[in-house]
């Protein structure tokens, strides 16, 4: 983390439980981010907050530290049963819930508090076995939590702390009725610690906060600009015929350590994936049709560096928290201006530099004026040499193909991707096909 991303406030200066301080210290957390520095003094006084903060600002650690400290400093409800969690964290997507649970384990291993996670797309029985053993902190998506509540597997009458993360997304995805259903089954708002976080504190989000929280204090970390100064933006105007070749050429030229390619439709994402896969790149595909177990595996491979490129739709990528993304490629300009900000905001996080490359083709160029008005600046235009684009591109790989023991096209016997003439393309260490710069100002 860079110094500009952190405040001067140290976690050690807070009156936190010693086990929490130990966990933070072992994980390398010394200084707070601004949202942590502002929210924790309020939360540690057992006061509710409604926080406005963008993804990547450290809000997850803020509410996890507050939740763990609250449970450790508050007596367990008398007569609490095994099926009664003491805290609940609601997330709009399973990917975000999984990420929160991973972060929570850093604190759980030192404090003795048990963490459980539930979300759709996974076996009810597998998740139920965890719940049957009892959990202190329940993390999950609202739909699956409601299923277990209605079955009597979970009882919310002992909840002492509750977190609603990315509340604005909850509205966008139509989960507000679910949230109100769950709040009505918890103890009174005054008897629990309530935390709400949202990228924007719109009137509907504030109404939700005041309906189900105890006079929450507002904590606002609003960026001065919708897009970070750490992100270098550029836009190209390719023809439809050259669009794919331009993408492949730029990826070859940029050789990104970790990149996400966004496209507007499932079909387009599959097409992009097939060309990248055929060209020997280590690439994963995330669309709404990808089964949940495969989604999790792809995300783990991407996070661990086993995949270098992720191709995704906006819906499939919602709630993803992946660090160290160096490049974002908007193969299609999004129809929604906010999606542009969300997309490129996945790079340039925590004070690091990032690159955003967008294509304004014939089909989506009309989206550009609204996007530039929304972000209050023009995106620098970069020209390119059509004659310099790659022309020795292998045929794309079919999306739905059978796997067998024979080596696939573009792969060697070890299963690792290969580049041109069998050169290894994976790992960002293999030789590239050219050194020619294709960008022209």
UniProtKB/Swiss-Prot annotation:
Complex and partners: Component of the RNA degradosome, which is a multiprotein complex involved in RNA processing and mRNA degradation.
The name this protein goes by in its record: ATP-dependent RNA helicase RhlB
Key word Lyase present: no
Biological process, per Gene Ontology: RNA catabolic process
Phylogenetic lineage: Bacteria, Pseudomonadati, Pseudomonadota, Gammaproteobacteria, Alteromonadales
Motif, DEAD box: chain positions: 165-168
One Gene Ontology cellular component annotation held by this UniProt entry: cytosol
Keyword match Hydrolase: yes
CDD domains per the UniProt record, alphabetical: DEADc, SF2_C_DEAD
